[in-house]
Amino acid sequence: IDGGALGTSLSDDGRWLHDNVHLLTSELQGVCEAFKAKQKMPLVRTANEAIIPRVIVLAEAYLAKTEYQFSDKNFASYVEAFQQQTVLKTKELWMLISALKLVLLERIVERGAQAIANPKQSYGVGVCVSSLRDTSQASWKDILEPLILHDHILRKDPAGAYARMDLETRDLYRNKVVEIAEYSDFSEMEVASEALTLARESQQRRERDPRVALRCSHIGYYLLAEGATSLHQRVGYTPPLRERISSFLRRYPDEFYLNSILLITLAMMSVVVLLLMDPQVSPGLTLFAMLALFLPCSQAAVQITNYLVTSLLRPQILPKLDLSEGVPDDCMTLVAVPSLLLDEEQVRRLVDDVEVRFLGNHDRNLHFALLTDLPDSRSEPREGDPLVDLCEELIEELNQKYAGHGMGSFLMLHRHRVYNPREKVWMGWERKRGKLMDLNRLLRNEYDSFPGKIGNLSILPQIRFVITLDSDTDLPRGSAQRMIGAIAHPLNQAIIDPEKNIVVAGYGILQPRVGVSVQSSGRSRLASIYSGETGFDIYTHAISDVYQDLYGEGIFAGKGIYEVDTVRQVLDRRFPRNALLSHDLIEGAYARAGLASDIEVIEDYPSHYSAYNR
């Protein structure tokens, strides 16, 4: 629409159309895409015998009653009153957004045509355009969540966790209810009620382990975890083909993963040999050629198998509690950064980085500590060191700077070097692993290996979780609270087998996704080639990971959050001294590490090949 089409001047209705043409175009495209998606929506027959989705009739009735003036409050009240007679499915509630826009667009077209035909008359186009804009800007999650009726049932969770979970996890639970209802004879309300009944029944059983009791009494246990089988049997759930394949793969992960790699490797080797080798070549030479092909073919087979796994299995999202308003007292956490003190510039940078992490994740129950050693020495070290004194002074300055702000505190815990007869040097016992083991003992008043201590030591016995980071690891805003919320969730709390003394359910350690900083990716040719996508994704979402999606466990890479008591019980004194060159993998196997791929930390990428190979 332009002024020339309507004469030299536009009417008020024409002006509304002219000024909002981009809004109308974009909303029309969005509505078309929404209704193109093939969804089974309840249909109704209108007065003129047309059969259309029920949500469109509901949207038309609401807008007609309000004279096409949208308000989130009266809309919620209208739908709530409607559901007292007829319960809407969850997908219908979400389709109401597009239905409202569709009805408004139809009315804008109708009134716009009238305005063009008779520009001197007012037809109220502006009211419809304003309502269309309001529907686009409305906070629909806040509007629609209270209208999901089976959500009210889930909030009766006997474990008391559902109402404290974050929005993404509540959506995960609700979508699971919708999926089960779609492939069973039960409605969404009935599926949620059966899950609640199972959770309440579990409370009648006496479990020796209180964590097992909490896990089984949580409604999510019957939606996402081992209890889902019981719920499926009760409601007569018939899973779709994709779900059957996923369940089969997760039930037999080793058989699928290892056999797939083996079969693909043998197939590739055989094809190459048959195509390139002369039939008259001796069997010995053929065997040698196949052995030479084994390594490259096996690597290709691993990549192909990984692709198959990530194509067949959806990314596994770990449920989380919502701690955005504050970390509770029973989840007090210490962010610990093990590091060596090398020179004055490096010490100042260490303390500056601790302050940056604090400012992005400050909370009264979140504290920050440097765990420090001095470099290895061939000779017996002397008492005192100016670098230690400098670090203590800088940590004290931080505590004074932020005192009285109602936030966490800063600590420095420094160890003396001890003689290692095997390495023949004076060094911090067991290096990084030793720092964390010594920290765990200090937190539980078992043994004090830190003669140098600065900060509020009274909080140490109350620490439940430790977030361990490397000195070059950034902790993006809010990521600490999300990690704590994940590991504190009832389905993620570690359950230890008393006989094997290993974690068999839940997780003792959670590893976030590790991204690469933009600055480090440009420091060398090696970093720019291998670092891939860099920077922090502010819309961090779950991504596929072969081991987490297939086995339900991730690979611990030394950065993440762990529960102090669990790690102490499972790992303390488990391995002989000076025996582990890389301790992260084996510790993650015993303590059961999980990957929270929708939480991200950022670190520097190695700038030279020797560092890359460590």
Model-predicted segments: where are they?
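Juxtamembrane helix-loop transition segments at the membrane interface in multi-pass membrane proteins
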Residues: 305-319
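Internal catalytic domains of large membrane-associated glycosyltransferases
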Residues: 121-247, 316-614
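A structural signal for well-ordered alpha-helices, especially hydrophobic packing surfaces
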Residues: 2, 25-35, 86, 104-112, ...
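Short, charged/polar, low-complexity loop and linker segments
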Residues: 2-9, 81-85, 90, 149-157, ...
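Generic structural signal for well-ordered, non-transmembrane alpha-helical segments
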Residues: 18, 22-29, 101, 106, ...
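Active-site acidic catalytic loop and adjacent metal/ATP-binding pocket
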Residues: 5-73, 467, 473-478
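Alpha-helical bilayer-embedded segments of polytopic membrane proteins, i.e.
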Residues: 98-107, 244-306, 512-516, 556, ...
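Active-site activation/catalytic loop segments of kinase-like enzymes and analogous catalytic loops
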Residues: 51-93, 100-114
